[in-house]
A protein has these predicted regions:
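Gram-negative outer-membrane beta-barrel transporters
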Residues: 385-390, 489-492, 511-592, 633
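Outer-membrane beta-barrel signature, preferentially recognizing the C-terminal barrel domain
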Residues: 263-286, 325, 409-413, 418-422, ...
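Periplasmic-side early beta-strands and strand-to-turn transitions of outer-membrane beta-barrels
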Residues: 160-162, 186-272
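C-terminal beta-signal and adjacent terminal beta-strands/loops
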Residues: 204-207, 441, 492-494, 585-591, ...
Length: 658
């Protein structure tokens, strides 16, 4: 609590000092720095707008100086990034796990169906232009399994009027290096974007007050990584009625997995291979005779090859087990939209995926095991808008089938449905209200049902789907220098899939009868003057499961009660800009290895600071030099028991943009 008080006093004093000593001035028109945080916006495009959509544009993304998506975690509403014992960085929104959330990159799913996860620490940032987040049960147009939210990541917009590019070099602690480049160009018919990066690091430094014989040095054991990424996109406008987009994403990585602290038999893992290659084709076409009837579509194919080497001990010399896996994934989605009257739209959607997972494990006799899953969703959605009211209702039929072995022996076939309904009412040009309800099912993944995770889990092929019943209501407002967003939410998750601790120091996934989650979210953004902007975000969350007595009293792991963040952006003078970020997390519980009961993680406050100076080399070329300190006070904190996070770290570098 003393740290929190110090943080609050510090930030208040900072605002007062800069307000008094550096009175705001109107910036010159050719200033290369934009000093306002304009991150929270409501999607006003004529697509389902029955829920507020929170957006993070490239200015916030650039100021994070990150190299991968996981470094943006605290910038997303009601979210936290958690690194698990496999070394994977995953996102949680409103306490919902990564398997309950779908991530899309330019409309193509990023989640790997084998476990419906994606390691965000391996997804590059250099081509990302905007991230938008829909919380709760989304539109049925997103297909299966998205029961708690959708994160849409879009690549940077191509300016067809000129060629543009950016080159970045960054350096940091533990011999961390990052180099990236991006170039785009074209004309009104054909345009392109190419981006690539290479990053390497020997690991991260632990906070100064951490001490444990399992990690005797200040550098985290086995925390290094190396990654090369390449993204390309071509846009073709073949007529006034249609466009075609082709993109590729290649990620070639190697990473180490820090072993858990104070665990009898931790994982001594390394990934000598993690390679993902994807090709996607998407487009839209407006039909003749009407400008309101169109089809949007995307199809993609992805190949993922990963290997885990398990070592005997912390010397990382002798390999005693390994797992090699290959995934082939096909995704598809088509949405037909038609205006059936001057005030209503009708949409038809078909979306789904087909995946094949092959794995070979040394301890299981090097026998190739094959798993197949096919999921499809057929949906219909009706949107009505009249004057200040917009409503939406949708239903879908969802199906999942799982087959095991080369002969596709059917293991199970599950059918279910999803339904959503929502309303948004604009009180005037500045204020609006919204409410929504929904039901949606998530099918168990192949890994949840059949994988032992190299001896860490006991498989449970009898897992049932989990079904979410959700509702939320909100109030939004805006003024000429900012806006706010207040939302209340409630979710009942039936047969929720959670893990339990077993006596033999293993885990098993089971279905909980009912999990209840409720809370509130508040976002407030304000540009105080042309020099100072701030963004405040606060989430209160209560998540409990029903016990045998029928009372909501059982604790759940890694669902923090309080999450809050503050961003303050200040321009001292032309081209000199600073940003301070404060993150606060409180009252979170987790299972420790071999202990059947939950234990509370320590609360923490993290403060980060950035300073950047931009030089205009010409009318079209700018150079920025920056420095950044993360976790200024070197705070020891955990997002999962046994896995301490990084202490104070430094990074700096330069970027050239033209």
């Amino acid at each position: 609590m003393n740290t929190l008080k110090i943080c609050c006093i510090y930030i208040i004093c900072l605002i007062l000092i800069v307000t008094v000593c550096f009175p705001g001035k109107a910036q010159e028109a050719d200033t290369l720095i934009t000093s306002r945080i304009e991150e929270v916006t409501v999607d006003a495009v004529r697509t389902p707008d029955w829920k507020p959509v929170i957006k993070i544009d490239h200015r916030i993304i650039d100021n994070k100086d990150g190299v991968s998506i996981d470094e943006l975690g605290n910038s997303l509403p009601s979210s936290k990034i958690q690194t698990n014992s496999r070394g994977e960085s995953s996102i949680y929104i409103r306490g919902a796990g990564e398997r309950q959330i779908m991530l899309f990159f330019d409309g193509v799913p990023l989640n790997t169906p084998w476990d419906n996860r994606i390691d965000l620490s391996l997804i590059p940032l250099e081509a990302v232009g905007e991230i938008s987040v829909t919380r709760g049960i989304p539109s049925v147009t997103y297909g299966v399994n998205a029961i708690s939210g959708v994160v849409n990541i879009t690549s940077r917009t191509i300016d067809n009027s000129r060629y543009s590019g950016r080159f970045i070099s960054r350096f940091g602690d533990n011999n961390s290096r990052y180099f990236s480049g991006m170039f785009s160009g074209g004309n009104n018919v054909l345009s392109y974007l190419v981006a690539g990066s290479h990053r390497t690091s020997e690991g991260f430094t632990l906070p100064g007050d951490f001490s444990h014989p399992d990690n005797p040095s200040n550098q985290r054991v086995n925390s290094g990584s190396d990654s090369f990424n390449l993204f390309s996109k071509v846009n073709y406008l073949y007529s006034r009625r249609g466009s075609l987009h082709i993109s590729t994403l290649i990620i070639d990585s190697r990473k180490q997995v820090p072993p858990e602290i104070d665990v009898a038999n931790p994982r001594y893992w390394r990934y000598p291979l993690w390679r993902r290659v994807g090709l996607a084709v998407s487009g839209k076409h407006t039909f003749r005779g009407t400008s309101a009837s169109k089809i949007d579509y995307s199809i993609s194919g992805t190949f993922l090859n990963a290997q885990i080497d398990q070592y005997k001990d912390s010397s990382f010399v002798e390999i005693n087990d390994y797992e090699n896996s290959k995934d082939i994934i096909f995704n598809g989605r088509a949405v037909y939209s038609g205006m059936i009257s001057s005030t209503s739209f009708l949409r038809f959607v078909v979306a789904g995926f087909s995946t094949r997972h092959n794995e070979v494990i040394l301890s299981e006799g090097n026998i190739a095991r094959v798993y197949n899953q096919h999921c499809v969703s057929f949906g219909i959605e009706y949107e009505y808008f009249w004057k200040s009211i917009s409503t939406l209702t949708g239903v879908s039929y969802d199906h999942s089938s799982i087959a095991v072995g080369d002969h596709n022996l059917l293991q199970n076939s599950i059918y279910d449905y999803s339904a959503t309904a929502g309303i948004m009412y604009s009180i005037n040009n500045s204020y609006s209200m919204n409410a929504s309800v929904g039901r949606k099912t998530r099918f168990p993944t192949l890994r949840e049902s059949f994988s032992g995770a190299l001896g860490r889990f006991v498989a449970n092929p009898d897992l049932k789907p989990e079904t979410a019943y959700s509702m939320d209501a909100g109030f939004q407002g805006s003024h000429n220098r900012g806006r706010f967003d207040l939302i209340f939410f409630l979710t009942h998750l039936h047969d929720g899939i959670v893990r339990e601790s077993l006596p033999e120091k293993k885990f098993r996934r089971i279905n909980k009868d009912i999990i209840r989650t409720y809370g509130m979210e508040l976002s407030y953004q304000n540009s105080m003057n042309d020099n100072i902007s701030m963004l405040f975000r606060f989430t209160y969350l209560s998540a409990l499961s029903k016990n045998e007595a029928g009372v909501f009293a059982d604790t759940l792991e890694y669902k923090p009660q309080i999450m809050s963040s503050v961003y303050v952006l200040y321009s001292f003078r032309k081209n000199l800009e600073s940003m301070m970020e404060i993150n606060y997390t409180r009252k979170e519980y987790g299972l420790r290895h071999g202990i059947p009961s939950f234990e509370e993680l320590p609360s923490y406050v993290l403060i980060h600071f950035r300073l950047g100076y931009t030089i205009g080399l010409s009318n079209k070329v700018s150079l920025e030099v920056f420095g950044r300190v993360n976790n200024i006070f070197d705070k020891l904190h955990y997002t999962q028991w046994g896995l301490p996070e990084a202490g104070r770290s430094f990074r700096g570098g330069a970027s050239v943009e033209f």
